[in-house]
Amino acid sequence: MRNIGKCTLLFTIGGIGYAGVEILWRQKTHFSMVIAGGICFLILDAIRRKMRGSSLVLQACVSALAITLVELAFGIIFNIIFDMNVWNYSSMPFNFLGQICPLYTALWFLLSLFIIPFAAYLGELLFGEAENCRKEPKKSKVQ
């Protein structure tokens, strides 16, 4: 039950945060971006926990790719299949289907550098997760 509450809270924070970033950046958002943001924040939290011993830069790289894949999926569903025209990156260099492009992947990387420590802070504050920057070295069995 605690996990459901944690996921619900993280989804809500991510959804509101993602929509907020979009409103600041584009002065508008769409309900699908709240859903995408919630999913992305859950994924980022999972990446943060699984890659706990890795550098923040590596975690941010993986996170940026994950967010980009979520954007691609949502773009295909909402922009291409349902023709809702939520966004269109067709004019951006090296775009794929007008749904994703390297510039926004780079921006997600930069944002992830802040979002990942924020997720760690929330994990510690709200859920009592101990956060180590690096994994403890394994102790040798031979002494």
Which residues does each PLM region occupy?
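Aromatic-rich, lipid-facing transmembrane alpha helices and their immediate juxtamembrane interface loops
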Residues: M1-Q143
